[in-house]
Amino acid sequence: MSTKEATSETAVDYSLSNPETVNKYKIAGEVSQNVIKKVVELCQPGAKIYDICVRGDELLNEAIKKVYRTKDAYKGIAFPTAVSPNDMAAHLSPLKSDPEANLALKSGDVVKILLGAHIDGFASLVATTTVVSEEPVTGPAADVIAAASAALKAAQRTIKPGNTNWQVTDIVDKIATSYGCKPVAGMLSHQQEREVIDGKKQVILNPSDSQRSEMDTFTFEEGEVYGVDILVSTSPSGKVKRSDIATRIYKKTDTTYMLKLQASRKVYSEIQTKFGPFPFSTRNISFDSRTNMGLNECTSHKLLFPYEVLLDKDGGIVAEFYSTIALTKKGTIILSDSEPKEDFIKSDKKVEDPEIVALLETPIKVTKNKKKSKKPSKANE
């Protein structure tokens, strides 16, 4: 990049006060929401998780191509499709050669789907939980899905200027308890910025005593964007563990290191070029016999962050809902969201706390883009 180009880029206003920034987040959110609805429809008895993940990424790419059509537009997948059933808490996205590629969904499976898109580096991720069933869902599966959905709604309304991260942690815990469930221990929600989905400000779920004492307390502020990731389990502890399943989702970090292996340099160069700072699936890179060796060196020296496949320690059912929100001058805007199908989840439990009930009934702004496309500013061309 030339000095002139660098100076021009630093002059661009990427804050929420720039309507174009908000518009890009909204477009990314619409893409993510529309795609995840289609992926939910793919979750039928006999459907293989590998096929669903591949099709999810195809749908993301197809949808992304149709929006923000400018010359050399910077846009793409912000999180590859992950499909995690039952006690698999997160990040299952297998290669065709993996044993899990043959894992097929069956009736009654509780399936979590996570994916996301970005426009010009502004990412909107979304996650939902569905059940492979034609009939309404009852029992523990219904309880955990209802708990996670209600907890997300409460978090969306608690994350606002003046409140702290611990208020969110505590209200999610109270709601999960109302449904006889537990938030998944140690799961994080992050502040987001351009090209950053894991910013410094974090909200932790179900922290240990040491995590609670070590994590900073912070106040939410106007102008911030958050990826709100709520995971709840039917298990009594909510604790998860790393599985033996191969990690297939990674993200490039800001760490620097002189790689020794040619295979490492090759794969790292491809990652930089194709995905930049966003998570990617190794399904989408050139794979040969030395690729795993290259990925291992990159990971061991922290050039790549691995999104490991996590399992509930006690075999509990895990539900997840993820929403991207923006704290604007006019209030909170929900940029991406996904709720369970109406009248599909039949839990016999509910939130009783009158303050939380009132909070859940508080209106919140949901984005609706105008059908007429807006011409991007020159800064985005």
From Swiss-Prot:
Motif (Nuclear localization signal): 368-375
Organism of this sequence: Schizosaccharomyces pombe (strain 972 / ATCC 24843) (Fission yeast)
GO cellular component, one term: nucleus
Pfam families reported for this sequence: Peptidase_M24
Record-given protein name: Curved DNA-binding protein
Modified residues annotated as Phosphothreonine in this record: 362
Purpose: A non-essential protein that preferentially binds curved DNA. Binds non-curved DNA with a much lower affinity.
CDD domains: PA2G4-like (cd01089)
